[in-house]
Design a protein with these regions (language model features):
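Active-site-adjacent structural elements in enzyme catalytic cores
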Residues: 1-191
Length: 192
């Protein structure tokens, strides 16, 4: 279906990788859990390319990765309880579902009134987000329905020629992120 050259980068190339993302490219990179597949936030065409390369259903929203609580506040409503949870558990393998800010475009959330946000516990990814100057929309770096990889070779087996670039390396391979729904204060739910 897609056939492009997937460029290879090292973690030291963070500025070049950030430029690719800012220019709407789809990039795979190791995170604190599994390999992620990301695009810059607020680029609808980049998000479409990500979903196409992954074979992801259109109606499934992509989680947002942020570098700090201030970025969270720009895209989600952050009641005091959510700020306290973020301070206690982020950065880490912890995703909060929050009510989105009215200014957040519907295509980011697939029309849902909520947004999933995570601050990864990975210095490279945090630096990458800061270099981009905006959050990233990041999902697992695999074809939908296929095994999620923690090593670059696993990702390339599925996505080589379907994505613009990959940052070589290995994810920390921790368990998937714990998800806490804080969209209705007073009623929190959790799943791992």
């Amino acid at each position: 279906m897609m056939n492009m050259e997937t460029r290879r980068f090292d973690k030291k190339d963070v500025k070049e990788v950030a430029e690719l993302l800012k220019n709407g490219q789809v990039v795979a990179f190791p995170t604190d859990t599994v390999f992620g597949l990301g695009v810059i936030y607020e680029n609808e065409e980049a998000l479409r390319k990500l979903k196409e390369s992954k074979g992801r259903p259109e109606n499934k929203p992509i989680p947002t990765m942020v570098a700090d609580v201030e970025q969270m506040k720009c895209i989600a409503q952050m009641p005091a309880e959510a700020v306290a949870l973020a301070d206690a558990f982020m950065p880490g393998a912890f995703t909060m579902i929050l009510k989105k800010q009215e200014t957040l475009p519907d295509y980011v959330t697939n029309g849902f009134p909520t947004v999933g946000i995570r601050m990864p516990d990975d210095p490279f990814v945090l630096r990458l987000i800061k270099e981009c100057g905006k959050p990233l929309l990041v999902t697992s770096a695999n074809r939908s329905g296929e095994e999620t990889g923690v090593r670059d070779e696993q990702v390339l087996e599925q996505l080589d020629g379907r994505i613009d670039a990959i940052v070589l390396g290995e994810a920390k391979g921790k368990l998937a992120s714990t998800i806490v729904d804080m969209s209705e204060i007073g009623r929190a739910s959790c799943r791992e």
